Amino acid sequence: MTTQLDLIKSSIKSIPNYPKEGIIFRDITTLLEVPAAFKATIDLIVEQYRDKGITKVLGTESRGFIFGAPVALALGLPFELVRKPKKLPRETISQSYQLEYGQDTLEMHVDAISEGDNVLIIDDLLATGGTVEATVKLVQRLGGAVKHAAFVINLPELGGEKRLNNLGVDCYTLVNFEGH
C-alpha cells in the first residue's frame, strides 16, 4: 500500500500562490493524468468501505464527483450529487454554511436520501470541513446518517478532520499535505 500511496502523492502537483498569494494549491488533475495513480486512489477507497454497510455514496461539487462515482460503481451502490444552488433539475433541499469570507449554499435532491441510509461522503480535499459539515446536515435532514467520509488529500493544520470527528464522522484520507 505504501507504494500506491507514494504514487498517489507524487502524482499530485503543488502550485504555489494559486489562487492567491500564500496559498499552495494541490492539483488533483495531474493525478487523473496517471491512470495507475487514479486507479490506486479508487481501489484504496473501495477497499476501505467494502464491508461498512454503506447504502449510498455521495459526492460533493465538483471534484467529489470524479472520485465518488467510480467508488459507488465499484461498490455496487447508488451515487448522489451535492451541488451548488440551481444546478439540480428536481426539487431540492438546501443548506447554507459559513466560509472564511462570506457564506455558500449546497443543494441535493429531496429524494436522494432515504430514511436510514448509511451514507459515505467523498471529496477530493479536506481543509476546514465546512462543505462536508453542510453535506452531513443535508443527509441528516433527509433521514440518513453519515459515519464515514473519504478524501484523497487532507490539509491537517486546517482542522477539518477534528471538526468532522466532532460530528461523529470518521475520516479516511489517502495523503496529507502540510501548508495550505
Curated annotation (Swiss-Prot):
It is found in: Cytoplasm. The keyword Cytoplasm applies. The keyword Transport does not apply. It is an enzyme of class 2 (transferase). Pathway: Purine metabolism; AMP biosynthesis via salvage pathway; AMP from adenine: step 1/1. It catalyses: AMP + diphosphate = 5-phospho-alpha-D-ribose 1-diphosphate + adenine. GO terms for cellular component: cytosol. PROSITE patterns: PUR_PYR_PR_TRANSFER (PS00103). GO terms for biological process: adenine salvage; AMP salvage; purine ribonucleoside salvage. Catalyzes a salvage reaction resulting in the formation of AMP, that is energically less costly than de novo synthesis. This is Adenine phosphoribosyltransferase.
